[in-house]
Every structure is written in C-alpha cells, then in structure tokens.
C-alpha cells in the first residue's frame, strides 16, 4: 500500500466519525425529537447520510484498486482525492439543498451534489480505464 493511499484512507476512516454523529442527529430528526422539518427535508437528510456512508466505503475500496492499477502522481492523486471528495460533495448537496425553514424544494446548494457526481464519475472512469490497461 502506498503512502498516498495510507494518508487518504486514514483521513477517510477518521471522517467516518462525522457520519456516525450524523446518524445520531438523523435518528433524532426521524424520531420527532427535533420538530419542524418537512418531509422533503427529512428525505434529503436520509439521502445525504446514506450517500456519505456508501460513497466512503466505495472510496476506501477504490484506494486499493488505485494502487493495483499503478496510478501514481499526478493522476493517482487526482483519483484518490476525487474518491475522497465525492462523499463530502454529494452529501453536502443533499444537506445543503434542504436548508431553510419549511423547505419543500431543493435550494441552490444542490449544485454540490452534481459537482460530487461529476467528480465521482471522472474518478471511476480514470480508475476503471487504468485497471483495464494494467491487466497482465
């Protein structure tokens, strides 16, 4: 495992604690502890939390594939950072889009979701292509 992968993986594992905290907050919202959220907001919060967790797991797995594909600087760094940034951007888009009292429509911060989708897509294509080229 490369030092670059160890660095990004270590940061991602530490970031999982924020997803855990978000889960306790989400549980409070869904249980009615925090009143005043619309169904739209609750749905966006659920989606943001779920995407953060799933995309973080994908990022950790992709880091190992990045090493196997032989991707090194600067493309390797771009792929690693792209996979690590995608969960943050996508979940920020879901959470940010739901901000505002009584919100029932996505706000302007939904743009972060789409930025995250494109970053993730680019990282997937680069890594997938590199893996196909690295076949022995």
Mark where each language-model region is.
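Polytopic transmembrane helical bundles with strong interfacial aromatic enrichment
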Residues: 1-136
């Amino acid at each position: 495992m490369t030092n670059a992968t160890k660095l990004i993986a270590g940061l991602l594992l530490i970031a999982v604690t924020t997803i855990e905290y978000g889960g306790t907050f989400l549980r409070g919202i869904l249980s009615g502890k925090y009143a005043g959220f619309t169904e739209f907001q609750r749905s966006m919060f659920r989606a943001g939390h779920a995407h953060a967790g799933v995309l973080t797991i994908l990022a950790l797995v992709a880091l190992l594939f990045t090493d196997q594909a032989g991707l090194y600087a600067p493309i390797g760094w771009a792929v690693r950072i792209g996979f690590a940034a995608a969960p943050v951007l996508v979940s920020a888009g879901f959470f940010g889009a739901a901000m505002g009292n009584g919100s029932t429509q996505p706000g302007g911060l939904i743009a972060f979701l789409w930025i995250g989708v494109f970053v993730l897509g680019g990282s997937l294509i680069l890594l997938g292509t590199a893996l196909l080229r690295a076949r022995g």
